A protein has these predicted regions:
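Positively charged, small/polar-rich N-terminal and surface patches that mediate targeting and assembly
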Residues: 1-114
């Protein structure tokens, strides 16, 4: 069984919708980390640099769900709109601590059309 890490860096106002959409597309869980950062066009106010708040959402997903999750979130949450966020996926070489999830995944694989 192969897994990917899907990471979404999004406006905190989109977090709930991103999680709901990702779960609807096959994600089984998430981790949300509060963060801040700047984009390509830095924000300034009275000469001071302003860092935007962002949520970093992590999803460990089955490899075959990665594209569906990313496409669904990108479309439903308008990730391509400026300021909404970005998404990336990374290969996971090794994983532990997912025995309950793997059991559920195996059950789901019996009924899924790949």
């Amino acid at each position: 069984m192969r897994f990917n890490l899907v990471v979404a860096f999004v406006d905190p106002n989109l977090t709930e919708k991103v999680v709901k959409t990702a779960k609807g597309a096959g994600a089984t869980g998430d981790v949300i980390i509060k963060g801040k950062g700047t984009g390509i066009e830095p924000s300034n106010f009275l000469g001071l640099s302003i860092q935007d708040k962002t949520d970093i959402i992590l999803f460990v997903v089955e490899e075959h769900h990665t594209n569906k999750i990313m496409d669904s979130v990108s479309k439903e949450c308008h990730i391509e709109d400026p300021g909404n966020g970005i998404m990336i996926s990374l290969n996971i070489d090794r994983v532990s601590g997912l025995s309950r999830q793997i059991k559920k995944i195996r059950e789901n694989l019996k009924t899924e059309q790949l």
